[in-house]
C-alpha cells in the first residue's frame, strides 16, 4: 500500500457544501485541515504544499480549488437535522465520505475497524484499509473523531446515514435558543416546546393546556381526586411525589432552607423566598385598583377581593362564604374542632399557623412589626396593617347600603347593624340590647354606679368620659355646640334640642 498523502486526510467541499456550513463550522474546518497538514509534514509524509493549504493560510475560500474528481453531494438530510448538528459531527460525516471515496471499490459493507486490529478480515483490501486508517487516525486531532473506539467504513450512503443515527451516545443535537445538547432529534424537538408558546396537551375536563403530557397527567388528579402518594407516618395522601417529600420534613424536622440574615430556617423553599423579602423590603406585587404593594402574590390575591367583594369559597356546614380558600379551611376547623398547631411553650393549640405565630409573641414579649411613619411597634402584623391606615387614610371596607367607608372590617360589621336593626349585645341586668359591645359596656356602669372619670379641678366624678369632657368645657366657659340657623352657642349639645 502506498504512503498516506494529504489527499487521504483532506475533506473537500463543493460551493454548495461550503455555503451550507455556518461560520463556526468553516473555522473548525480551516483549523483541522491546517493541523492535518502540519502533522503530515512532521511525519515526513508530504513534500509540496497543496493548493488548498495555501488558500487556507491566506484565509481564502477553499471551495474553488481545482480537484481531480467531482465530489458527490452529501446524502439528503432534512433541514432540522443539518441546522442542529454540531460542527464536529459534520466534519466526521465528511471525513467518512473521503475514506469511502478512496476505498469504496472494495465492495465491503459495514467493515468494523478497531485500533487493536480485531475483526479485520483476511482480505488484502481490508488490511490495507485498516493500516491506512490506523495511520491516518494517529495524525488526526481527537476533535474529528470524538468517539474512536469504533470507526466504520461504508460502501453505501444509506448505511452511513443509519450509523450516524446509531451514534447517539454522543450528544449531537443542539438547541439554538439555549445551547442545550441532546442525544436524539426527537429529544431536541420535545425540548423546543419550552421556547415556544405551543401547548399540545389539553385537559378534557377544564380545557387547560400543558406543554408536557406528564404535566397533564398530574393535573388530571385534581379532577379525579387521585392521591397516590401516602405518608407512612400520618397516612396523609398527596397528588404529587414532590408534595409528599416536602410534607415528610414536618415529621423529620428537616429545615434545609436557612436565612443568612436572621438564621431562621424553613422546611420549604417557597416560604424561605417569601421570608427574604422581609429583609429586602421588596414588594413586587402591586394592586392595579389602589396601588398597594405586597411581598406575596397570595396577599395580593386576598386583597383584590376587597375591591370585587367576591367570596367564592362557601362552608358546607353553615353557609358562610370566604374570599380565600385558606380562610375557608381555617373556618372549617371550628366545626371539626381540629387544632393542628400547638404551642411548645404552654401546650395551647390553634386552628391556624398564623394565630400560633401571633400567640408565641406572648411568651417572647417581642413586638417585631414597626410602623415606618411613627415608629409604633406591634405584636401582630395584622395590627400594624390596620394601624397604617391611620397614616394613609385608606378605607377599604365600604357599606353597600349607604356607601360609607371604614378603616377596619369590624367597624363596618358594627355599622351594618344600623341598617339591619340587629342588636346582639344584651344587658343581663335589665335586658336592654345594643348594636355595639362598647355601648353595652357603657350601659353596665349605670347598674354598677361606678364613676371612674373624676374632674381634677373640682373632684366631681362621672360614669362616662364624654360626660367628664362636657363638664370641663363648662368650667372653661367653652360653648362648642352651635345652632346653625341663628348662630347661638351652648355648653351642652343637649340644649340644642330644647
Swiss-Prot record:
Record SMART domains: KRAB, ZnF_C2H2
GO function term, MF aspect, one: RNA polymerase II cis-regulatory region sequence-specific DNA binding
Transmembrane residue ranges: none
Location in the cell: Nucleus
Stored Pfam families: KRAB (PF01352), zf-C2H2 (PF00096)
GO biological process, one term: regulation of DNA-templated transcription
Zinc finger (C2H2-type): 173-195, 201-223, 229-251, 257-279, 285-307, 313-335, 341-363, 369-391, 397-419, 425-447, 453-475
Record domain KRAB: where: 4-75
Family affiliation: Belongs to the krueppel C2H2-type zinc-finger protein family.
Record's protein name: Zinc finger protein 682
Amino acid at each position: 500500500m502506498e504512503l498516506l498523502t494529504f489527499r487521504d486526510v483532506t475533506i473537500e467541499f463543493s460551493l454548495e457544501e461550503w455555503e451550507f456550513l455556518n461560520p463556526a463550522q468553516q473555522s473548525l474546518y480551516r483549523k483541522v485541515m491546517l493541523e492535518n497538514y502540519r502533522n503530515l509534514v512532521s511525519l515526513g509524509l508530504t513534500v509540496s504544499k497543496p493548493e488548498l493549504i495555501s488558500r487556507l493560510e491566506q484565509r481564502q475560500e477553499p471551495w474553488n480549488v481545482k480537484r481531480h474528481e467531482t465530489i458527490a453531494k452529501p446524502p439528503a438530510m432534512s433541514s432540522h437535522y443539518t441546522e442542529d448538528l454540531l460542527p464536529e459531527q459534520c466534519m466526521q460525516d465528511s471525513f467518512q465520505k473521503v475514506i469511502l471515496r478512496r476505498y469504496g471499490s472494495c465492495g465491503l459493507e459495514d467493515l468494523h475497524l478497531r485500533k487493536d486490529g480485531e475483526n479485520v478480515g483476511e482480505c488484502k483490501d481490508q488490511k490495507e484499509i485498516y493500516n491506512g486508517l490506523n495511520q491516518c487516525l494517529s495524525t488526526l486531532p481527537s476533535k474529528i473523531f470524538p468517539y474512536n473506539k469504533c470507526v466504520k467504513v461504508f460502501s453505501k450512503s444509506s448505511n452511513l446515514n443509519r450509523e450516524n443515527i446509531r451514534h447517539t451516545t454522543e450528544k449531537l443535537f443542539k438547541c439554538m435558543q439555549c445551547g442545550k445538547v441532546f442525544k436524539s432529534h426527537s429529544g431536541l424537538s420535545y425540548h423546543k416546546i419550552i421556547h415556544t408558546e405551543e401547548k399540545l396537551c389539553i385537559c378534557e375536563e377544564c380545557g387547560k393546556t400543558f406543554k408536557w403530557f406528564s404535566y397533564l397527567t398530574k393535573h388530571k388528579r385534581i379532577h379525579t381526586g387521585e392521591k397516590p402518594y401516602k405518608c407512612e407516618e400520618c397516612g396523609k395522601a398527596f397528588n404529587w411525589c414532590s408534595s409528599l417529600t416536602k410534607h415528610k420534613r414536618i415529621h423529620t424536622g428537616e429545615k434545609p432552607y436557612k436565612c443568612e440574615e436572621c438564621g431562621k430556617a424553613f422546611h420549604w423553599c417557597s416560604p424561605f423566598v417569601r421570608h427574604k423579602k422581609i429583609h429586602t423590603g421588596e414588594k413586587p406585587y402591586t394592586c392595579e385598583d389602589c396601588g398597594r404593594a405586597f411581598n406575596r402574590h397570595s396577599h395580593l390575591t386576598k386583597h383584590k377581593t376587597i375591591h370585587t367583594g367576591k367570596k367564592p369559597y362557601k362552608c358546607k356546614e353553615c353557609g358562610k362564604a370566604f374570599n380565600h380558600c385558606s380562610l375557608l379551611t381555617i373556618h372549617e376547623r371550628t366545626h371539626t374542632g381540629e387544632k393542628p398547631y400547638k404551642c411548645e411553650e404552654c401546650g395551647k393549640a390553634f386552628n391556624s399557623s398564623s394565630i400560633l405565630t401571633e400567640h408565641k409573641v406572648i411568651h417572647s414579649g417581642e413586638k417585631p412589626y414597626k410602623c415606618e411613619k411613627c415608629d409604633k411597634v406591634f405584636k401582630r402584623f395584622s395590627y400594624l396593617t390596620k394601624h397604617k391606615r391611620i397614616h394613609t387614610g385608606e378605607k377599604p371596607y365600604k357599606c353597600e347600603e349607604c356607601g360609607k367607608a371604614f378603616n377596619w372590617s369590624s367597624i363596618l360589621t358594627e355599622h351594618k347593624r344600623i341598617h339591619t336593626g340587629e342588636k346582639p349585645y344584651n344587658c343581663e341586668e335589665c335586658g336592654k340590647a345594643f348594636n355595639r359591645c362598647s355601648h353595652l359596656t357603657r350601659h353596665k356602669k349605670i347598674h354598677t354606679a361606678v364613676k371612674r372619670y373624676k374632674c381634677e379641678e373640682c373632684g366631681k366624678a362621672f360614669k362616662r368620659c364624654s360626660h367628664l369632657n362636657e363638664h370641663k368645657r363648662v368650667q372653661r366657659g367653652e360653648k362648642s355646640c352651635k345652632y346653625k340657623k341663628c348662630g347661638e352657642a351652648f355648653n351642652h349639645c343637649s340644649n340644642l334640642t330644647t
